[in-house]
């Protein structure tokens, strides 16, 4: 068995916490960084900068350096909210240039098998935003997975009694896929072909 220094062992352990990074990839990344001290320093500084300056928007819960974020503070359509699972889903929607409203990030999807309930998501915050009376449409853009569909159905049941139009991205995005990996043209068609729930 190979023994590494305490600091290298710690680095490997931290790298393996990243999604898709196992033992071999962590080792490859660590040695790459060690071969280039300038890159290692730049990465460390960048991580500290993100930790100090990036936070969640107090309105939509997207990622921002300013609060509220630029999407909440601009003159976008204030009558429509697009609900997404994760902050990176906003990027997919924005790449399509098809949606002109505001966003709301749930930070996950309902998954009783994994212990994720409505209280674990930003659903109460969404409902509070809807109480203002200014919102006329909620576009549900959760992923087309079992969890995403369950979340969409749950939200629809909560929102419909408020007499707010509830729409869903058109099916055209493959089932079982994550929104962040869909190309801009497909997202645009899905937004334009959204349907009433």
From Swiss-Prot:
HAMAP family: RecR. Belongs to the RecR family. InterPro entries: DNA_Rcmb_RecR, Rcmb_RecR, Rcmb_RecR_Znf, TOPRIM_dom, TOPRIM_RecR. Keywords: DNA damage, DNA recombination, DNA repair, Metal-binding, Zinc, Zinc-finger. Signal peptide: none annotated. GO terms for molecular function: DNA binding; zinc ion binding. SUPFAM superfamilies: Recombination protein RecR. May play a role in DNA repair. It seems to be involved in an RecBC-independent recombinational process of DNA repair. It may act with RecF and RecO. A zinc finger (C4-type) spans 57-72. This is Recombination protein RecR. One of its GO terms (biological process) is DNA recombination. Residues 79-174 form the Toprim domain.
């Amino acid at each position: 068995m190979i023994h590494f220094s305490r600091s290298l062992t710690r680095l490997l352990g931290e790298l393996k916490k990243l999604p898709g990074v196992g033992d071999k990839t962590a080792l490859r990344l660590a040695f790459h960084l060690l071969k280039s001290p300038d890159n290692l320093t730049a990465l460390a500084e960048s991580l500290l900068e993100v930790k100090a300056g990036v936070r969640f928007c107090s309105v939509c819960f997207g990622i921002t350096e300013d609060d509220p974020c630029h999407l909440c503070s601009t003159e976008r359509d204030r009558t429509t909210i697009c609900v997404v699972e994760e902050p990176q889903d906003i990027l997919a929607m924005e790449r399509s240039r098809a949606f002109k409203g505001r966003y709301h990030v749930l930070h996950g999807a309902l998954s009783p098998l994994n212990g994720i309930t409505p209280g674990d998501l930003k659903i109460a915050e969404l409902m509070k935003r809807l109480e203002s009376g200014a919102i006329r449409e909620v576009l549900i853009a959760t992923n087309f997975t079992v969890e995403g569909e369950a979340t969409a159905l749950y939200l629809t049941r909560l929102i419909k009694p408020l007499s707010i139009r509830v729409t869903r991205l058109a099916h055209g995005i493959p089932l079982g896929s994550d929104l962040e990996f869909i190309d801009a043209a497909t997202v645009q068609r899905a937004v334009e072909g959204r349907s009433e729930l």
